[in-house]
């Protein structure tokens, strides 16, 4: 399997499966002198962790501590410039829950495509295709966030919609301490009620996550094929559940006239930010704004129609422990992916002068 490394200068390579001994990765290309220790990475992992407070009733019953162990690349609290290795053990996997799936393909999952490509698949939770894989992204993204902080660049992410119920973005700064990473305290009860009802129906929910980066200098991004917005879209779409990405006004731009969509240029910046902080694939100094649409988790507690590995029709009811709504755990993942892109682009710009 190829495609396990992300980035050009600041590179993250990940390994591990949902029901293997553990997951981890190596960050290569991080400069020396970045303040970093296990607590810095752990803080981000705790935001994504199964059973975290942000997920509430929406989360999986699988309770992984997600304790990170740094293996290399850090000495006396700073990076050394050498590869940064880390490992996170799987401690609460229950592979016996998946025995019935050995000969059945789960609708909405990558079972059938992995089988088509490799001639085999890990039916214990999906292996590399599991959302569990994203724990390594969050750990690698924490290193990127530490580097960006040295340059006064901040990345944050929050939920703007669950199950078709939108939030008003009134307090994005407080979203991290709120259920569902909501920027709107008033919408939380409606989301809780929706999750409760959908759980009772044996179904799942999707939603939309917004990622913002402030302090990004003008000039990041490499036309023509490595535009900053193209790289961010690549990063977001590489997350298994993401099905669409918008930048700035996004889909709404199709409904605007040019006179409405253009951001007037004024002394010191721009009057509006429909461009989402990127023009011509290059950052313009405005906040970067990206939204990702996340599909409902396909593991549902309802009977579904599928086929077995011999192509015969078969009913399926998925067991195991799964999220009702993965949005709260996707939020830190998308934040991490944006950080990886920005750290890589920043280092590339510095190298090119």
UniProtKB/Swiss-Prot annotation:
Species for this entry: Nitratidesulfovibrio vulgaris (strain DSM 19637 / Miyazaki F) (Desulfovibrio vulgaris)
Keywords: Amino-acid biosynthesis, Aromatic amino acid biosynthesis, FAD, Flavoprotein, FMN, Lyase, NADP
Cofactor: FMNH2
The keyword Coiled coil appears for this protein: no
GO terms, biological process: amino acid biosynthetic process; aromatic amino acid family biosynthetic process; chorismate biosynthetic process
Gene3D superfamilies reported for this sequence: Chorismate synthase AroC
Cellular component GO terms, alphabetical: cytosol
Top-level class of the enzyme under EC nomenclature: lyase
Entry protein name: Chorismate synthase
Lineage, broadest ranks: Bacteria, Pseudomonadati, Thermodesulfobacteriota, Desulfovibrionia, Desulfovibrionales
């Amino acid at each position: 399997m190829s495609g396990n490394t992300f980035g050009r200068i600041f590179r993250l390579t990940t390994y591990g499966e949902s029901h293997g001994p553990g997951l981890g990765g190596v960050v290569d290309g991080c400069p020396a002198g970045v303040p970093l220790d296990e607590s810095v990475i752990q803080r981000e992992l705790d935001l994504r962790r199964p059973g975290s407070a942000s997920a509430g009733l929406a989360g999986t019953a699988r309770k992984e501590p997600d304790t990170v162990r740094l293996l290399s690349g850090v000495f006396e609290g700073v990076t050394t410039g050498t590869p940064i290795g880390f490992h996170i053990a799987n401690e609460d996997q229950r592979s016996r829950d998946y025995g019935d799936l050995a000969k059945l393909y789960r609708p909405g999952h990558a079972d059938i495509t992995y089988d088509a490509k490799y001639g085999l698949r890990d039916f214990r939770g999906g292996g590399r295709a599991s959302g569990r894989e994203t724990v390594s992204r969050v750990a690698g993204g924490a290193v990127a966030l530490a580097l960006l902080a040295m340059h006064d660049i901040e990345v944050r992410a929050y939920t703007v919609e669950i199950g078709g119920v939108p939030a008003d973005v009134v307090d994005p700064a407080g979203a991290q301490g709120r259920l569902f990473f909501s920027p709107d305290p008033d919408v939380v009860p409606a989301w809780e009620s929706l999750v409760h009802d959908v759980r009772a129906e044996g179904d799942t929910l999707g939603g939309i996550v917004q990622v913002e980066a402030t302090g990004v200098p003008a000039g990041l991004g490499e036309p023509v094929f490595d535009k900053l917005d193209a790289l961010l879209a690549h990063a977001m779409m590489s997350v298994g559940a993401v099905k669409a990405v918008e930048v700035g006004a996004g889909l709404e731009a199709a409904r605007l006239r040019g006179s409405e969509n253009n951001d007037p240029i004024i002394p010191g910046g721009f009057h509006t930010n429909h461009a989402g902080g990127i023009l011509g694939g290059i950052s313009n100094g405005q906040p970067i704004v990206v939204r990702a649409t996340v599909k409902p988790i396909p593991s549902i507690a309802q009977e579904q129609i599928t086929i077995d590995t011999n192509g015969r029709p078969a009913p399926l009811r998925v067991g195991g422990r799964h999220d009702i709504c993965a949005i709260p755990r996707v939020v830190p993942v998308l934040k991490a992916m944006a950080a990886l892109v920005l750290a890589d682009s920043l280092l590339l710009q510095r190298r090119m002068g």
